Amino acid sequence: MCLILLAWQSHPDYPLVVAANRDEFFSRRTAAADFWGDAPDVLAGRDLEAGGTWLGVTRRGRFAALTNFRDPARNKTSAPSRGELVIRFLSGTQSPLEYLAELEAVAAAHNGFNLLFGDMESLWCFSNCGEGEQALAPGVYGLSNHLLDTPWPKVARGKSALDAALHALPDEAPLFALLRDDSIAPDAEDAAAA
């Protein structure tokens, strides 16, 4: 389950704090985060199969990150790569609102996804699986393979840990510690019996 935790306009010195794990499709070859030769403004990892990315930033203050929406029944084998949605925003010059209109036009062609994207002025979450778009107010958010702030145990623990880690900045150690959380959520039956 991929996880993106972020604090938007919640710290006086850091307008955006992100802690994220990409922990699915391990067999898919990737390149580590670096500035791209064909898009030198973009700092991101790279999907070596389809050429896109799952998370990146630019020197101009643009940010985008993607999670897959888990719904195997809706998967289309011929759908375009969702990683293209991230790089299209990062390498583009359109405003977040203009990009939102572009997303709405192409969203149905893709398998389920959630996309966080924005610049230093605004941050948006877009899902093609139910909630559409949402402008994010200042706060701490968690996104996994369902909708923004779905109260899954890993998301809830991560948001709480990120909120606490904000108080330790500029010390980054608590951010890395929260990403090492390997707790396993109890099955619904186990939780009901407890």
Residue ranges and their predicted role:
Residues 1-194:
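N-terminal nucleophile
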